[in-house]
């Protein structure tokens, strides 16, 4: 029975990934995205992001993503699916399949103002969704280590410290 449950969960995650990847394909480049696509990014890189918003990691992801379409679409899908996946791991749901669908449904009914600032354009997405995913991983690690007193594998601990550092950039 456990194999069937895992299989259903895997299929749901693949469907969520495909949905968000397709959304990424349909989403056109907007104002900031087009700026990063132009020579603006080389000017900003020359001065080390000095006049920018301080979201260095998101801006670097944005620069790469606007120049490599397939990577932009795939990262849009993976980060979006990763947020749902991390929420499920934080909550430690027993009925995984139904909760994945519930979390996905709730993500789809975001208020339009929040959607416009995050999922509605790639600059906002890489600045906010990426940091949300990193924050969720940090919360997941802390809950497991502090509340449940679970010993984390070395690789997860290293990832925790790396993401904690880069999450501030």
PLM feature segments, named:
Residues 155-169:
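Membrane-interface alpha helices of multi-pass inner-membrane proteins
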Residues 77-99, 137:
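Transmembrane-helix motifs of polytopic, lipid-linked glycan transferases
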Residues 34-42, 60-67, 91-92, 139-146:
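Short juxtamembrane and helix-loop transition motifs at transmembrane-helix boundaries
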Residues 7-31:
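Transmembrane signal-anchor helices characteristic of membrane glycosylation enzymes that use polyprenol
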